[in-house]
Amino acid sequence: MKTEAQPSTSLLANTSWTGTVISDSVPGSQTWEDKGSLTRSATSWTSEAQVSAARVAEAQARTSQPKQISVLEALTASALNQKPTHEKVQMTEKKESEVLLARPFWSSKTEYILAQVGFSMKPSCLWRFAYLWLNSGGCSFAAIYIFMLFLVGVPLLFLEMAAGQSMRQGGMGVWKIIAPWIGGVGYSSFMVCFILGLYFNVVNSWIIFYMSQSFQFPVPWEKCPLTMNSSGFDPECERTTPSIYFWYQQALKASDRIEDGGSPVYSLVLPFFLCWCLVGAFMINGLKSTGKVIYVLVLLPCFIIVGFFIRTLLLEGAKFGLQQLVVAKISDVYNMSVWSLAGGQVLSNTGIGLGSVASLASYMPQSNNCLSDAFLVSVINLLTLLVFTSFNFCVLGFWATVITHRCCERNAEILLKLINLGKLPPDAKPPVNLLYNPTSIYNAWLSGLPQHIKSMVLREVTECNIETQFLKASEGPKFAFLSFVEAMSFLPPSVFWSFIFFLMLLAMGLSSAIGIMQGIITPLQDTFSFFRKHTKLLIVGVFLLMFVCGLFFTRPSGSYFIRLLSDYWIVFPIIVVVVFETMAVSWAYGARRFLADLTILLGHPISPIFGWLWPHLCPVVLLIIFVTMMVHLCMKPITYMSWDSSTSKEVLRPYPPWALLLMITLFAIVILPIPAYFVYCRIHRIPFRPKSGDGPMTASTSLPLSHQLTPSKEVQKEEILQVDETKYPSTCNVTS
């Protein structure tokens, strides 16, 4: 289909004056309920209206654009031409309760950028990126990721930011305005965001549980617990490592299989509830409180990561870890699976397709430079990933070194016992002094043995290899809760470093949870006027609902379901949602038309390359990623690592057939609103392209919108006046 700019007038500007708006306790936005404020004198009001008219006229004179009548001018002219009578000032109780002025703004652009960065800095994305770097090509994967980030990630992030900011709508309503027939994509993104929010705080509850246990000395995952009424260690723990035992048996109380049910784990219910209380407390007072909390939640992990990185550079094995960081497998550049993994990671790290990006951007002025914001957020996110991955590899190098040292010492003890028992000849006696660098001393001794003695030794002991141990880093949450916690226990003082590490993860998790919940709360407020006036009631109700539903994932088998959704399922609906978003802007609204509107709003030209990326390259790349992942999913069975209580070992099990059926069912449910809303539009004869011009356009939200294209300077002026209007509510209502 064509993506040419339409000759009709734009729909982008002035949406904040006519669309749904949120009442919030931030500067420049309030819900006015004081009846006295509605009865200002006509003389005072007229004077203020004249000042407003003069300001708008000055803004029009400064631009070369054809003069257009803005909503503010229409209100001003109407007010100046007629005296505000007592009857017009009077409002019914019903109308008075619905007086909601301008949508709130972020207190500063810094808060907004930090909110977007905090939403994208999910702990799971950080450790998954490091895991993929380690196991999917090294620097080759990193190069592919960076290429995909700027080719696909930044344009799509810019698209969502521009849509939300221009339309002043959350992730559910914005697409109804841009493309009525594709309006169902907003409902799909809302449902995906809701499902993600159900289990996201469960991961945060794991972090809080570990943090609460880190005050013990030694930390409980450093040594096996003693059996009750005995001086011996727990035999189940002795058959594995303390960190693995603590993860499965103490933290998760994991079942042997996903089929095993059980009630919620009580030791996780309280941390889970605490997570929701913290997120609710941060959001209950709107953007004013959220913005201040974001400073701490985003900046604190950055300082901790830098401090950790400096500290780990001084550890033994850090150099080996950094050497593994720069390893590149050139053959993986030609592997489509690696490209699809990098593309999926770009979608996860940028957070597009969930509606949260558009919701956060909807609280910015329409003239804000969202293109530079998209680049800035992406670059900050990329730098955070690179620093965090470098820190990860330093820690893993230290962890692998310590484990290998202990392996060599254990082998030496085993060999001495076998020699004393006469099972090995005296020539197989290992070096006595393994205190300093035991791995080098042990390996040098082993390589110097005669071949027949060496063969006898290797049959009795395990191989101790630092490269092999380095590659044993676990996937998913276990990357942090197994490999990392064990490494922190090796680092004195282990209590301090463990607490700081989990504090960093918790801050990241909470900032991401705020972004996810903003993608749920904002669309509900935009859609239902009742929720705009009762924000606190909405937040409490939604959080209680999600807490109750999320208890399902705190059961003994809950971690297996989280892996099913996060590693295998969620990327598919996100790709479909993003593809339809590009269709909405590129085909229904028109990519060139959208860019032309943004050029006027922002006051500077935007590269026409986006008019080619959105309708052509991005959808094709996303569909290739979708097909590649689908083929990989069909060819290779999906698996999960479970706990076998009989052997106290981790066991790789395939997901049962009903798990795949569950994925398909969930996918169908969240995608269903797209065709369903299309059918609704066809039945009600809603046009494919949004109407525009002088007449009102009725969007799928049934909101009459009269949109006029306004130059950048004028938009900025109206944004200033919009804040001024909140001081004089009668100005906005005297002509209604």
From Swiss-Prot:
Where does this protein reside within or beyond the cell?
Answer: Membrane
The GO biological-process annotations, alphabetized, read as: amino acid transport; neurotransmitter transport; sodium ion transmembrane transport
Pfam families found in the cross-reference section:
SNF
Residues annotated as glycosylated are 229
Q: By its UniProt entry, which InterPro entries does this protein fall under?
A: Na/ntran_symport, SNS_sf
Tell whether Magnesium is among the UniProt keywords. Answer: no
The record gives the effect of mutating residue 236 to K as: Found in a renal cell carcinoma sample; somatic mutation
Extracellular side stretches: 220-263, 404-495
An example molecular function term from Gene Ontology annotations: neurotransmitter transmembrane transporter activity
Signal peptide interval: none
Tissues showing expression: Highly expressed in peripheral tissues, particularly in testis, pancreas, and prostate.
Family, per entry? Belongs to the sodium:neurotransmitter symporter (SNF) (TC 2.A.22) family. SLC6A16 subfamily.
Stated name of the protein: Orphan sodium- and chloride-dependent neurotransmitter transporter NTT5
Q: Which organism is it from?
A: Homo sapiens (Human)
- Which gene is annotated as encoding this protein in its UniProt record? SLC6A16
